[in-house]
Amino acid sequence: MNKDKLRNIAIIAHVDHGKTTLVDKLLQQSGTLDRKNMTTERIMDSNDQERERGITILAKNTAINWKDHRINIVDTPGHADFGGEVERVLSMVDSVLLLVDAVDGPMPQTRFVTQKAFEKGLNPIVVINKVDRPEARPHWVLDQVFDLFDNLGATDEQLDFTVIYASALNGFAGHEPDELADDMTPLLDMITKKVAAPDVDESAPFSCLLYTSDAADEVDRG
C-alpha cells in the first residue's frame, strides 16, 4: 500500500473512559469486523485478566480499512499500573486519540500519558466520549482539556486540536455534542484527514519497531 494512505495512531485514556469500546465500534462500523461473526465482546482485551477486569493491560494493535486508507490502531493501557506499556508505543505512531469521559474530564493518568505524547511531538485528536449520559458536561470537559494541554506546555499547533464528540457505546460521533451522526464516520474521516502519513525513507534498508509478538502453544505437524 502507498505509505501516504497509512495512518498510525494510539488511543490513550484513563481506565473506564471507553477506549476498548470505541475500538470495537470502529472495527464493526468500518466493515473490518462483522458483529454477527464476533464471538466475544471487548475485542482488544485478549487475555482473561483483561476481560475479567475490563481494562487493557498490554498494548494491542489492529487495523481498519476506511475508504482508501488503512488506519493502524494501537490500543494502549489506561491504568496507572501499566503506564510503561503506554510510553513504549508512543514512538511508533504519528498521532494520538485522547479519549476523555464527558463527565469526569481529564484524569491523572491522562495527564501523564499526554505529557509523554507532547514530548514526542505528537498532535492529538480529542474525543469526548459518553456525551449521551444525562450528567454529561462536554463544554466543561473541553475547557479542562485545553487547560491541561496549556499547563503541560503544549505548542500552539498542539493547542489547536480537533475535537470529536462521541458515544462509543451507541456507535455515534459528531463535531458537536448535540449534533451526532448516526455512526462513527466523523471520527474515521477526521483520522484520515488530520493524522499525518508515516515519515519514512522508502529507499533506506529495511527496519522496523516490533511492538506485538505472540506464540502458539500448538503447531500443525501435518
Briefly describe each language-model feature range.
Residues E135-T192:
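Canonical P-loop GTPase G-domain recognition
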Residues E202-L210:
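Glycine/charge-rich, flexible interdomain linkers and switch-proximal surface loops
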Residues M1-V100, D104-P106, V113-T114, Q144:
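P-loop NTPase switch module centered on the Walker A-proximal segment
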Residues L97, A117, S167:
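Conserved phosphate-binding elements of NTP-dependent enzyme cores
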Residues A102-T155:
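Conserved C-terminal guanine-recognition region of P-loop GTPase G domains, centered on the G4
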Residues V93-S95, K120-P124, L159-F161:
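Short glycine-/polar-rich loops that comprise or flank the Walker A/P-loop
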Residues Y211-E218:
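Conserved small/polar residues in nucleotide/adenosyl-binding loops
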